[in-house]
Amino acid sequence: MMKKKILAIQGSSLKKINTNTDTTVFLALEAQRRGYQIYYFEPQDLSFLSGKVTAKCFDLTFFKNKKKFYKINKKLDFNLIKAKIILIRNEPPFDQQYINSTFILEHIAKKVKIIKRSNSRKNWNHK
């Protein structure tokens, strides 16, 4: 049995995505085309417990439709170590929640490819 390819996206609320300017939907559509299953979560959905980094994720299907651009298939608790890639898409306010998410994700950074790694944004904040 082939292991499924999972792209986990950490982003802002789905309701706040502007499909005219935000490339998150485009990236998710391309990942789907390449056979990835998309799991989406917000920074506050992350947890680190008993050595595991998990997130309360939405299993999503994305569409090209700008008005209804996603469908929630299910909600699940997901061990992020099982993701092939974690894509960081949210813009920080540089607050405690953001800092917590950077520290949590650092625990799996050597085992999961993290694109736009949080610690690089924390350590080299350009604002």
Predicted features and spans:
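Extreme N-terminal starter segment of soluble prokaryotic enzymes
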Residues: 3-8
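Extended, domain-scale alpha-helical bundle/helix-rich regions
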Residues: 11-12
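Conserved N-proximal alpha/beta basic substrate-recognition cap immediately N-terminal to
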Residues: 15-127
